[in-house]
Amino acid sequence: MHLKGKSPMNYIGRFAPSPSGPLHFGSLIAALGSYFQAKAQQGTWLVRIEDLDPPREMPGAAAHILRTLEAYRLHWDGTVVYQSQRHALYQDQIDAWLSTGQAYYCQCTRKAIKAMGGFYNGHCKIHPPARQQDCSIRLRMDNQVQQFIDLKHGTITIPKALAEEDFIIKRRDGLFAYNLAVVLDDIDQGVTQVVRGADLIEPTGRQISLYHTLKQKPVSYLHLPLAMDGNGNKLSKQNHAPAIDPTAPRQTISHAMQFLGFTLPTDFSDASAEQMLAWGCQHWQVSQLPEAIEITPRFSNGPA
């Protein structure tokens, strides 16, 4: 399989939402953070729809997300990529690994793995299943990553058992695993840095190990603070976070920029959405980012 790779000279970032619902305040934070980080470096900002899991998708959500980004004047570069149209890329890589023994079939259930202590112990690597039906596919973890550097959080240490685990790259239901798809897509699109929410810190080690297995240079990572509700839960579609209002971008952008640590000018109330974003690109600094912040309805779904 041929992957395009990336040029070291040009910054390429991306925003990659899943279409399981409309954009909410937490996903706007990820969009703005990745946008500011790219544009502050005169870089490219891509949008990719991560529609890998049809049972979790909401009909029409992908189009709604793109319309909302446009309403917020977050204009992406290039063409929107849909993971649902890239299955051949993922399967070709899996087939290549299966042919060399780098990947293998596994029939272990969640119940069986729980009995192993919660981490898969390599059972099917030693005892291959007699049949391939109803099996997942795992990658041999020959390139373990136990630490990585995050631009905000510094050195992140990954538990040894997690770092050593042969992880799933294709599920037993036939769906491709998130870790495999995002790494292959980021390599193919030339992404140089991933900016996303801190809830995705955990799989980062596995994704870096995939870069090493593919003999590619890993991207750098910046994990943004999470927007939390009053109960300490992350704002997410699963937690029924309200959709942001596409008809009132200025107020919500202002609130989101304050969340990201900006001290806004006193005359910002008269600025257009385009002017606010341009100002943000000029003044963005990673050092301004706060820790997780509680979000009230005033931030996520209310008037200015």
UniProtKB/Swiss-Prot annotation:
A motif ('KMSKS' region) lies at residues 234-238. Gene3D superfamilies: Glutamyl-tRNA Synthetase, Domain 3, HUPs. A motif ('HIGH' region) lies at residues 17-27. InterPro entries: Glu-Q_tRNA(Asp)_Synthase, Glu/Gln-tRNA-synth, Glu/Gln-tRNA-synth_Ib_cat-dom, GluQ/Sye, Rossmann-like_a/b/a_fold. ATP binds at residue 237. Its EC number is 6.1.1.-. Zn(2+) binds at residues 106, 108, 120, 124. GO terms for cellular component: cytosol. GO terms for molecular function: ATP binding; glutamate-tRNA ligase activity; zinc ion binding. Pfam families: tRNA-synt_1c (PF00749). Binds 1 zinc ion per subunit. The keyword Nucleotide-binding applies. L-glutamate binds at residues 14-18, 50, 178, 196. GO terms for biological process: glutamyl-tRNA aminoacylation; tRNA modification. Its cofactor is Zn(2+). Keywords: Aminoacyl-tRNA synthetase, ATP-binding, Ligase, Metal-binding, Nucleotide-binding, Zinc. Transmembrane segments: none annotated. Catalyzes the tRNA-independent activation of glutamate in presence of ATP and the subsequent transfer of glutamate onto a tRNA(Asp). Glutamate is transferred on the 2-amino-5-(4,5-dihydroxy-2-cyclopenten-1-yl) moiety of the queuosine in the wobble position of the QUC anticodon. Belongs to the class-I aminoacyl-tRNA synthetase family. GluQ subfamily. This is Glutamyl-Q tRNA(Asp) synthetase. The gene is gluQ.
